[in-house]
């Protein structure tokens, strides 16, 4: 080995955090040292510090994957308004994710078959929201404000879908009425 320690946390993030300065200041006051001025680093430190409860503090649009190498877990999350999409496939060997369903379906290890039931539902009802299923069999999506907690310690990945913690939306947390997405 090179003697360089492997970082505990890794983040794949697509989005924009509107309250970056506020969260960055709070984390810095708690001893977090920042190396960049990028909101991606704020998201990484917030998730490392607060876990999934950090999602309730985020104001912005995002889709993310946060890996904890010590616990061998992966958090997938999507913003409450669903501005940034997130698709995934999981089987006994792997988890594949991307911001577009055809990218997941086109992965060489993902069987690409049409989801005929979803195609029929889409064509007969003109629905644009299909829950977690997509037009590709085995490719799922996170609904707005949803997260997937993935554990990789056993014989195959275990994925639990649930609603992400929600905070208050508005100019500042704690002011005004709470708005549900």
Predicted feature residues:
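Cysteine-centered catalytic environments shared across enzyme families
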Residues: 1-181
């Amino acid at each position: 080995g090179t003697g360089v320690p492997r970082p505990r946390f890794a983040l794949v993030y697509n989005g924009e955090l509107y309250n970056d300065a506020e969260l960055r200041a709070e984390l810095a006051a708690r001893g977090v040292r920042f190396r960049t001025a990028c909101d991606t680093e704020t998201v990484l430190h917030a998730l490392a510090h607060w876990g999934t409860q950090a999602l309730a503090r985020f104001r912005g649009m995002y889709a993310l994957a946060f890996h904890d190498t010590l616990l061998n877990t992966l958090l997938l999350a999507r913003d409450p308004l669903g501005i940034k999409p997130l698709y995934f496939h999981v089987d006994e060997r792997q988890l594949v994710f991307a911001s577009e369903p055809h990218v997941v379906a086109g992965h060489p290890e993902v069987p690409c078959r049409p989801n005929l039931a979803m195609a029929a539902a889409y064509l007969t009802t003109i629905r644009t929201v299909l829950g977690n299923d997509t037009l590709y069999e085995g490719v799922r999506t996170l609904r707005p404000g949803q997260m997937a907690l993935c554990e990789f310690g056993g014989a195959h990945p275990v994925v639990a879908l649930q609603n992400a913690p929600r905070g208050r939306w508005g100019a500042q947390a704690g002011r005004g009425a709470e708005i549900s997405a």
